Amino acid sequence: MENITIKINGMEVSAPKGSTILEAARLAHIEIPTLCFLKEINEIGACRICVVEVKGARSLVVSCVYPINEGMEVWTNTPKVLESRRKTLQLLLSNHDRKCLSCVRSGNCELQQLCKELGVTDEGYYDGERTPSVIDDSAVHMIRDNSKCILCRRCSAICEKVQGIGVIGANMRGFATFIGSAFDMGLGETSCVSCGQCIAVCPTGALQEKSQVDEVLAAIADPKKHVIVQTAPAVRATLGEEFGYPIGTNVQGKMAAALRRIGFDKVFDTNFSADLTIMEEAHEFLDRVQNGGVLPLITSCSPGWIKYCEHYFPDMTENLSSCKSPQQMFGAIAKSYYAEKMNLDPKDIVSVSIMPCTAKKFEIQRPDEAANGIPDVDYSLTTRELARMIRKVGLKFTTLPDEEFDAPLGLGTGAAVIFGATGGVMEAALRTAVETLTGEELQNLDFTDVRGMEGIKEATYPVAGLEVKVAIASGLGNARKLLEKVKSGEATYHFIEIMGCPGGCINGGGQPQQPGYVRNSVDIRGLRAKVLYDSDKNNPIRKSHENPAIKELYATFLGEPGSEKAHHLLHTTYVKRKVNEI
């Protein structure tokens, strides 16, 4: 690719033709601040924070969208530039709820951080009329507080361009502009799928999950309740970011230790029920293939994807696996098998999950997720909520010793831990399905064709005389593209894995929020996913059907995969919804 040479702050910089000033500056290790910019998602130059001086230009230019040309001279830190950025921040503050002490994003707010770096304080803002403050808490999973919104449009961009939904966007014009749903509808009245990607990219506290930390702590304090917790595979790969660890650090041991010290009676691993999911899903897949069932079979682990399918592809709900998600399977087993084993009344068990996902808050309230007549899972907290809980009870996370999960629901395999990355469920299922079909042990357990962060992946595997065609999609916009190919007959598959969030659970809507400059320059998904693949590689048991705890569960309680008891506890149903219908 042809390079162009420009000068930035008097220093020559070579950058590919077509680059923006912002991109060229980063090649020179110069960080121009941004608020609205998300690479390839939201490149609109709306916030005006990234302005720079360009020789010959009549005014300051927006560096995130301004292309470079040969011989250009740029200055990023002149008094004029710095003053413009300060005034922009002051204008934003003049229409902003500045109650930082009570804001969930305090200390991790991009607006707050820029004000700190540029010396902007409460005393410098402009007083005057403010847009009306609107709080929308109609959705199960999140709250929208427009008094903290800076109109960066990151949320609407990711909802429309990446997820292909577009239930939030800019309303009205000029000073009256606000971000929200159309026709004054609450988010809970729309076909929002609760994926939380809007929260993940929000630079301020305008969007946040509905926290249940206090309710969980109250349950722990109740001596009549037996409170158990499960942690999803992806959480161990990301929780450390909340406590200063580099992206891509496995903190499984410290996480287990923290949960125990918070006061949970038992600390379990969702990897256990991920293995259980594979046993049921592999059985369902083989049954459909061998007995002429509906194909392709599509995975059901991602509740955001499930709700999306119900809204936008209701005619394909028959393709969905009837298996509950690992979270829900765990809850059902905890309030039946575990309760029986521990001689506990299921009504006295409070089941809590720690998930990378905000859609799990919706999933636990679905009517068919109560196998024992009571909810399978009582509370679902995000990774961020767990971090807040750890701080709230006064634990110093970084100095905690590494501890193990509790038996009997704390043992998981390498196949289970890769559920957290796109392609992981498919790979785990193939390990079990192939060995079941062939009756032979796999020599190579790594199905590398289904790995990687590409939005859509395809592979074909010859198994016992059958060419098994599989596909993987992550991000709902990619799911739509894949399913439209299936519906049109352009592509045929036996098995499809879909995850609602781009990259899978490691990039879930409940994961630690990284600032825009990190999201734009670091392979966050790849680093997080590597934690899971390394964990799989180092696990002595890498196939779900070889998990001894799962074997015991079937031998002593469930019988066999697909049994009547397994169907009652571990399988679910779906509904056909309309767009903008709850």
Functional labels for PLM-detected ranges:
Residues 1-4, 135-136, 176-178, 233-237:
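A short alpha-helix capping/helix-coil boundary motif
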Residues 4, 12-77, 81-83, 93, ...:
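Iron-sulfur-associated redox domains of electron-transfer enzymes in respiratory
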Residues 8:
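Conserved phosphate-binding elements of NTP-dependent enzyme cores
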Residues 48-194, 200, 207-222, 226:
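Fe-S ferredoxin-like electron-transfer domains
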Residues 163, 202, 338-342:
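Structural motif corresponding to the C-terminal cap of alpha-helices
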